[in-house]
Amino acid sequence: MWLQDRIATFFFPKGMMLTTAALMLFFLHLGIFIRDVHNFCITYHYDHMSFHYTVVLMFSQVISICWAAMGSLYAEMTENKYVCFSALTILMLNGAMFFNRLSLEFLAIEYREEHH
């Protein structure tokens, strides 16, 4: 008798695994961005912002954009319009998050140059 583990597996359409991974990274980046905006604009605790991890965050966002772009290319090959729409939406959200993060970093650099 073989012992078989019961493992729940997700079956995504072709290309949706990359899109799902990009969506999870988007939510992670959104949480970090909201925390940094809160520390920068509301509480003025600049030392609690994620300055030390800027390179890692930007690299992670570029990887997320690449995964979303590859997922949208796979979704374009399918006939399903919903998969294509969701993949392109996630790609646009990741691109917008990248530019929001970049603008926040430039604002923080400008503030540090003026006040320190």
Swiss-Prot record:
<keyword id="KW-0282">Flagellum</keyword>
<keyword id="KW-0966">Cell projection</keyword>
<feature type="transmembrane region" description="Helical">
    <location>
        <begin position="17"/>
        <end position="38"/>
    </location>
</feature>
<protein>
    <recommendedName>
        <fullName>Cation channel sperm-associated auxiliary subunit TMEM262</fullName>
    </recommendedName>
</protein>
<dbReference type="GO" id="GO:0031514">
    <property type="term" value="C:motile cilium"/>
</dbReference>
<keyword id="KW-0969">Cilium</keyword>
<feature type="transmembrane region" description="Helical">
    <location>
        <begin position="52"/>
        <end position="72"/>
    </location>
</feature>
<dbReference type="GO" id="GO:0036128">
    <property type="term" value="C:CatSper complex"/>
</dbReference>
<feature type="topological domain" description="Extracellular">
    <location>
        <begin position="108"/>
        <end position="116"/>
    </location>
</feature>
<feature type="transmembrane region" description="Helical">
    <location>
        <begin position="85"/>
        <end position="107"/>
    </location>
</feature>
<comment type="subunit">
    <text>Component of the CatSper complex or CatSpermasome composed of the core pore-forming members CATSPER1, CATSPER2, CATSPER3 and CATSPER4 as well as auxiliary members CATSPERB, CATSPERG, CATSPERD, CATSPERE, CATSPERZ, C2CD6/CATSPERT, TMEM249, TMEM262 and EFCAB9. HSPA1 may be an additional auxiliary complex member. The core complex members CATSPER1, CATSPER2, CATSPER3 and CATSPER4 form a heterotetrameric channel.</text>
</comment>
<feature type="topological domain" description="Cytoplasmic">
    <location>
        <begin position="73"/>
        <end position="84"/>
    </location>
</feature>
<keyword id="KW-1003">Cell membrane</keyword>
<keyword id="KW-0812">Transmembrane</keyword>
<keyword id="KW-0472">Membrane</keyword>
<keyword id="KW-1133">Transmembrane helix</keyword>
<comment type="function">
    <text>Auxiliary component of the CatSper complex, a complex involved in sperm cell hyperactivation.</text>
</comment>
<feature type="topological domain" description="Cytoplasmic">
    <location>
        <begin position="1"/>
        <end position="16"/>
    </location>
</feature>
<feature type="topological domain" description="Extracellular">
    <location>
        <begin position="39"/>
        <end position="51"/>
    </location>
</feature>
<dbReference type="InterPro" id="IPR040431">
    <property type="entry name" value="TM262"/>
</dbReference>
